[in-house]
Curated annotation (Swiss-Prot):
Pathways per UniProt: Amino-acid biosynthesis; L-histidine biosynthesis; L-histidine from 5-phospho-alpha-D-ribose 1-diphosphate: step 5/9
Active site (UniProt): 79, 180, 182
PROSITE patterns xrefs: GATASE_TYPE_1
Function: IGPS catalyzes the conversion of PRFAR and glutamine to IGP, AICAR and glutamate. The HisH subunit catalyzes the hydrolysis of glutamine to glutamate and ammonia as part of the synthesis of IGP and AICAR. The resulting ammonia molecule is channeled to the active site of HisF.
Biological processes annotated in GO: L-histidine biosynthetic process
Protein name: Imidazole glycerol phosphate synthase subunit HisH
GO cellular component: cytoplasm
Enzyme Commission number: 4.3.2.10, 3.5.1.2
Keywords attached to this entry: Amino-acid biosynthesis, Cytoplasm, Glutamine amidotransferase, Histidine biosynthesis, Hydrolase, Lyase
UniProt cross-references to InterPro entries, sorted A to Z: Class_I_gatase-like, GATASE, Imidazole-glycPsynth_HisH
SUPFAM superfamilies hit by this protein: Class I glutamine amidotransferase-like (SSF52317)
Assembly and interaction partners: Heterodimer of HisH and HisF.
Length: 209
């Protein structure tokens, strides 16, 4: 069972439809107990970083998401949800994030239209299980004005938009997609299926303990 975090700032329905499409069990929730009972977590997000962190704090979900990280449970952040996984953001004001990944969220300062919106090529920068069946140079769908300034060792896929944009990051059980896999056609569905596989493997490992 995958828990989709519902905190009022996520692209919940499109993520829900994607999980239905790949045939996985899910629950949409902001309940701490249900989140901790799940086998994997998806944190979507649309909006501003400070407001999102404020809502997560109000709902007492910051500590829950940090506990998910410490338990080794697979956690996937999408778009703003990915950005929230980092140490802090410069959006509107300096604001602390979940600190599950090293790095800072910075504003795109490029001679192109902002937000970065539409399809862009995603180049692999390392091998990871979520790449299974995904070709290097596949096109994925972005909508964002900020990007992650983070260590290269956690970047597994990147796009160019006047600056290197980390499109997919990972460290241990923590995964993040700056693009929207749920809006990226069959490539996105493949990556979500691979995340489902990671979740199922984690569940099996817990049952064998």
């Amino acid at each position: 069972m995958i828990a989709i975090i519902d905190y009022g700032m996520g692209n919940i329905r499109s993520v829900e439809q994607a999980l239905k499409y790949i045939g996985t069990e899910y629950i949409i929730t902001d309940d701490k107990k249900e989140i901790l009972r799940s086998d994997g977590v998806i944190l979507p997000g649309v909006g501003t970083f400070p407001k999102a962190m404020g809502v997560l704090e109000e709902k007492d979900l910051v500590c829950v998401l940090k506990e998910v990280g410490s338990l080794g449970k697979p956690l996937l952040g999408i778009c703003l949800g990915m950005q929230l996984l980092f140490e802090k953001s410069e959006e509107l004001q300096n604001c602390n994030g979940l600190n599950l990944l090293p790095g800072v969220i910075r504003k795109l300062k490029v001679p192109y239209k902002i937000p970065h919106m539409g399809w862009n090529e995603l180049k692999k920068e390392g091998e990871i299980s979520l790449w299974n069946g995904v070709e290097d140079g596949s096109f994925v769908y972005y909508v964002h004005s900020y990007y992650a300034d983070c260590p290269n060792e956690i970047v597994y896929g990147a796009s160019e938009y006047g600056v290197k944009v980390p499109g997919f990051v990972a460290k241990g059980n923590i995964f993040g997609a700056q693009f929207h896999p749920e809006k990226s056609g069959e490539i996105g569905m493949r990556m979500l299926k691979n995340f489902k596989g990671v979740v199922e493997a984690w569940k099996s490992s817990q049952l064998s303990i």
